[in-house]
Amino acid sequence: MDVELTHRPSYTHLVVDLSPGETVMAEPGAMVTHSPSVSIATESSRDGLVSSAKSMLGGESAFANQFTAEGEPGTVTLSPPTPGDVHHHDLADETLYAVDGAYLASAPDIDIDSGFGGLESMLSGAGLTPLALKGTGNVFIEAFGGLETIEFDHGESHVVDNDHIVACEGNVEFDARRVGGLKSTLLSGEGIVMDFTGPGTI
């Protein structure tokens, strides 16, 4: 699978070149164009109905479209539903946490889950519904507006407003907190922020 991101950063398209037999999964409605050799099938979450329900609670559809190159190479072009950018993240038996609605596409072996213990409760206080993308392969996340990647060394920290975080690697430590008291929140225009500590990438 070869990929290219075009028209960045405001109207990004994800162009996926598939070898015969290769597949890419995508959110319903993401397809812009595809080659005649590419077939489309719609399937529910790979983990069954329970995980499908969890994905819906995480802001994602319970279904995904499966694009497969049949017999010869093919190309699929995907795009987010709103103007914005797309980030390509390559997982190697790792986890990427993403906010609700950020998932665009992935390799077929990537597991998508929104139920992972206390983390869900913690992030719900920040107005975020977490989604865990796990496994090995390509993952593509999208956001309204431009996307910036920040890499942390071990012990390095950064503070991000909860409205501006899209995803973080599973090895990054993070917590949610309010900015001061009610007065500070009202006057500063800031409410809840996320404290991230490396190593890792957000």
Language model features: what each stretch is:
Residues M1-I202:
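Phosphate/adenylate-binding glycine loop and adjacent helical scaffold
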